[in-house]
């Protein structure tokens, strides 16, 4: 074969496909930015739109933290991208996030990716809008009132204490912390939010299957909107259907109990409140909406708290001087001696545990369970000198906003003392946002705070522990968790501080 033939062969084999690929990237970029608002003179934010159709979704899913850090270094606090099938602007920094969170209904509206809307359903609180959202939130908030939280304290302490005894019985072989914490938080959410008694600690087969179904659903919650066999969306919907089938049994049993008994005036779980709200309005119970709401409550009530509790175990294990100060505070309230029958927790005592509150805040600053929130632009508006076109998705980043917040010094250091002296509210309101903010802030944030305080108290007064692999590598999918599931060995705390 002569040289011209070799060159022609190389051109056809390598050069031409490369040119076609580059042309496809350019055409895709032009197609995406063609949806900009041409009546607005402001430029789009900097950034790239990735590969045709897939955008930059695969890079973000596979290399999330590395990918996002690279983007932030290259483009700053606001940039365009293409995620989950939609042109998107990613936003971070207190000033930028303030505009987004305070612009609900005026500039932006909640708009989760298509996969989230499909899997969780249109009837869940996260996907409702306007008066429907306001009304549903008002009902659910009754389950998180101070009076209701007081009712939950002993239930949470009982579940946590029972779980820790199991961990301590594992001895030298240790255990994987993250899966165990997820099971614990799932049991607590079942009891408190849905009013279901899940059975003996450790969980039966049905409970384990439900936990595994939630794990499968969660893994595939943020997927490309392609519903074909073996796709992420397909697997997520399949797991969701299993969850709905199991939850429907609990809902029907609860309805029968409520119909057979008189109201006792005691604390009501969120599911009971939703059922009674429909009855009070003379509405026919919508089983599909109840299943969607129950699934969302269980997801939010155990997935995020499990992430935060696992991070607490990590940081307290890595920083023994912080654990020492936690125990000193517990001792000062008379709670360290486990044999004392008068040391039962209550809301008043928990609210006095200021240092533990600082430890939880610092944990949520460094490892916020939820990395951000999704919105859609209702109209074209200006942000930091750029146009945000109408119809584009907007993601505000919680983790990046914490990373760049000016109010925090030595940002990578775990230092709960930074929260002892409160920051001015105006400065910290949008620099520290583990529960989001504005009208869409987390409905169960007070429940989460109390749950994490009780968990920390019980952990500190029952256990010492060793992280077998040292500091873990953290991954987000969709909540933050340790890649190695945090293997650890637990022993009894002997009570000396």
Curated annotation (Swiss-Prot):
Location in or out of the cell: Endoplasmic reticulum membrane; Microsome membrane
Cofactors that this protein relies on: heme
GO molecular-function terms, A-Z: all-trans retinoic acid 18-hydroxylase activity; all-trans retinoic acid 4-hydrolase activity; heme binding; iron ion binding; oxidoreductase activity, acting on paired donors, with incorporation or reduction of molecular oxygen, NAD(P)H as one donor, and incorporation of one atom of oxygen; retinoic acid 4-hydroxylase activity
InterPro entries, A to Z: Cyt_P450, Cyt_P450_CS, Cyt_P450_E_grp-IV, Cyt_P450_sf
Membrane topology: Peripheral membrane protein
Residues reported to bind heme: 442
GO terms under biological process: anterior/posterior pattern specification; cellular response to retinoic acid; central nervous system development; neural crest cell development; retinoic acid catabolic process; retinoic acid metabolic process; retinoic acid receptor signaling pathway; xenobiotic metabolic process
GO cellular component: endoplasmic reticulum membrane
Class of the enzyme per the UniProt entry, highest EC level: oxidoreductase
Gene3D superfamilies linked to this entry: Cytochrome P450 (1.10.630.10)
UniProt keyword annotations, A-Z: Endoplasmic reticulum, Heme, Iron, Lipid metabolism, Membrane, Metal-binding, Microsome, Monooxygenase, Oxidoreductase
Catalytic activity: all-trans-retinoate + reduced [NADPH--hemoprotein reductase] + O2 = all-trans-(4S)-hydroxyretinoate + oxidized [NADPH--hemoprotein reductase] + H2O + H(+); all-trans-(4S)-hydroxyretinoate + reduced [NADPH--hemoprotein reductase] + O2 = all-trans-(4S,16)-dihydroxyretinoate + oxidized [NADPH--hemoprotein reductase] + H2O + H(+); all-trans-retinoate + reduced [NADPH--hemoprotein reductase] + O2 = all-trans-18-hydroxyretinoate + oxidized [NADPH--hemoprotein reductase] + H2O + H(+)
Signal sequence extent: none
Inducing or repressing factors: By retinoic acid.
EC number of this enzyme: 1.14.13.-
Similarity-based family: Belongs to the cytochrome P450 family.
Chain's role: A cytochrome P450 monooxygenase involved in the metabolism of retinoates (RAs), the active metabolites of vitamin A, and critical signaling molecules in animals. RAs exist as at least four different isomers: all-trans-RA (atRA), 9-cis-RA, 13-cis-RA, and 9,13-dicis-RA, where atRA is considered to be the biologically active isomer, although 9-cis-RA and 13-cis-RA also have activity.
Protein name, UniProt field: Cytochrome P450 26A1
Source organism per UniProt: Mus musculus
Gene label: Cyp26a1
